[in-house]
Amino acid sequence: MGGFGALRTGLAYSRNYSKIAALSSALIIHQLRDMKPEDANPMANYAYYANIFGDLQTARERDCNPEVLVRQKLAAGEKLPEIFMACGSEDFLIEPNRAFRDFLKASGVPCAYHESPGIHDWKFWNEYLEPAIAWMVG
């Protein structure tokens, strides 16, 4: 599912989930507004993102943005799932992961955040699968 999908699904359906583990999350929704049809990034191209999020100009203001979901759930007084995040310090997604961690902290949402050397690959994810599972069952 990926880290973004885990966050989006767990937050959107927070009554069904008590914990979310998100590794190397593609939290790039803020960057999509400026994409043009000919643009691409290391993950995908404009058409891919438009197919997933619809109008890229408004995506960051809608509930496809995990930040919007957090704000909505907090405003409604709903309990949020606990969140475990990990991202490699050399991963091209490190800055959006740090920004989301900071957003959660500023919003008063606890987050077990982990960062260590690594890129966006299975070597890094394998390092954090066991700790994430231990955290989930602990």
Please state what every model-predicted region is.
Residues M1-G138:
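Non-catalytic cap/lid and distal C-terminal segments of serine-dependent acyl enzymes
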